[in-house]
Amino acid sequence: NNLAYNNEITRTGKGGIIIIGGDTKTLTPGNSKADNNYIHDWSEIYQTYQPAVTLEGVGNICSHNEMENSPHEAITYKGNNHIIEYNLIHDVCLLSDDAGAIYSGRSWVWYGNVVRYNCIYNVGSENHGPDGIYLDDAVSGQKIYGNILVNIPSNSIHVGGGRDNVITNNIIVNPGNNALRFDDRSREG
């Protein structure tokens, strides 16, 4: 039950806001929120895996934030039942390839997360082609809808394995490689 609200965060050596809360065993929500923050020019020393907002645990929210000008990801989340909505994300992943402006990965059990109504544009740079929204290495049970993705150099939305992911009603303009990419890297054998 914590709130990071209406802050400007800039020139950090690492990331911006880290929210860890809730109980993954009982799925009790943390009810913490990063809302209406302006986060820019972060990760000046540690340039990867230091996002503007990190959500971990259960039932936390990242909403109405603007994030820009970073070498790597804007939002990373781990756990269940998080909501990521109404964020404006641009000019991120400027020095990264195997990444996403919004990223989660490597768990079959992180069901119930919702990524909706975000605007993501101008991701990557001339020499780097990351994804817009990247569900990596078997992350499952995600709902991705109502997002606007523009000028994403690799895959606008990339689902790297996993199951029970629902991708609907997104607007994708000028994708690089693919608007949507699904692969079976972690399919059941």
Q: Where do the protein language model's features map onto the residues?
A:
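Extended hydrophobic secondary-structure segments that form protein cores and membrane-embedded regions
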Residues: 34, 52-55, 103, 118
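Right-handed parallel beta-helix
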Residues: 2-14, 28-43, 59-73, 80-94, ...
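Asp-box/WD-like beta-propeller blade repeats and closely related beta-sheet repeat scaffolds
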Residues: 21-24
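Acidic, glycine- and Ser/Thr-rich low-complexity intrinsically disordered tracts
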Residues: 182-189
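Structural detector of coil-to-beta-strand junctions
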Residues: 15-16, 50-52, 73-74, 99-101, ...
